[in-house]
Amino acid sequence: MNTHRPIESVRAHEPAVLNAAFNQDQTCFAVCHESGFQVYNTDPMELRMKRTFSTNGGVGLIAMLHRTNYVALVGGGRQPRFPVNKLCIWDDLKKKPSIMLEFMSPILNVLLSRILIVVVLKNKVLIHAFESKPKLLAQHETYDNEAGVAELSVNEQTSFLAFPGRAIGQIQLVDVSPAHRDRNLISIIKAHKSRIQCLAISNSGLLIASASQTGTIIRIHDTAKCSLRFELRRGLDRATVTSIKFSPDDSKLAVLSDKNTLHVYNLTAADPQPESAMANRLHLLSAVPLMPTYFRSVWSFVSYHIDTKDDAVNDCGVLGWADNESIVVLWKKKGIWEKYVLVENDKWTLVREGWRRFEE
């Protein structure tokens, strides 16, 4: 029997969620809206901090720095708190801006580490030192990147910055580890035939996953040699992949698209065995020589189709992992947090364990 309460329509007086993002280890997340921003613990979901601006409070982009008092803010919404081309590093202990950086065009994404501030513009990625007067360390040109696609890993041994290349379908992978940053080591991965839509780097920094605007294939390369490790099929129809995320131990990959289906793939073996309880699905003709790529594709070992209502059509979900068996989805239009758990019975299934609405 289904004992879950139905999800209500978003009430008109609730602040519209303009963006949502997890911190580096996904133990916290932040949401921003027309009047400020909030920070929550991921699991259990608990409000940790709420900042409401009395006037012109719209925040369109937010990025956390681990569990510190610093968050990166960019204005957005109907009445932006800051210009869309200006980055504010907000110090919530002092409740005021700590650093302000201005650029020549709108900021599309911001990524933080303890030593770096990365700003993504339409055709450029800029890397600054995270200090009181940030020094520009490097800048890289990209193909048109209107979605602000970029990913930064913060592993102590292997730190990488990934973003679209200068040619369609390519990924630029920059080694930003403190030991290598001055050498400006850049690798090019020819990942797809169409534009890069979504990126994710594993927690170990050893793997990078990517989806193109076609949205049918997810490819995973290793960061050391840029060689292809996995080719995963999401589906046959075109789709916009909104979020990709590796599990904390790198053993699984979660993928969410605008088809409202959450897929999970097993990455523990490059050639999953059919007898494995957690094996990905393979096409029956996959072993036949010279078969087209479709028949040799690896499919998710478990998936969940998420019911939607009219007010949540084209909603954009953001993925995070609470642990190696639990996935959290942040929904912007619905303004809710959802938790899904991998459960093994006769076969693996995804179970929707709970949901909560973001506070007003």
UniProtKB/Swiss-Prot annotation:
Q: Which InterPro entries match?
A: PROPPIN, WD40/YVTN_repeat-like_dom_sf, WD40_repeat_dom_sf, WD40_rpt
What are the record keywords, sorted? Cytoplasmic vesicle, Membrane, Protein transport, Repeat, Transport, Vacuole, WD repeat
Family annotation (Pfam families): PROPPIN (PF21032)
User: Which Gene3D superfamilies does this UniProt record tie to the protein?
Assistant: YVTN repeat-like/Quinoprotein amine dehydrogenase
**Topology in membrane:** Peripheral membrane protein
- In the UniProt record, does the keyword Metal-binding occur? no
Q: What task does this protein carry out? A: Involved in mitochondrial or peroxisomal functions and amino acid signaling pathways.
For this entry, the protein name equals: SVP1-like protein 2
Record organism: Pichia angusta
Taxonomy of origin reads: Eukaryota, Fungi, Dikarya, Ascomycota, Saccharomycotina
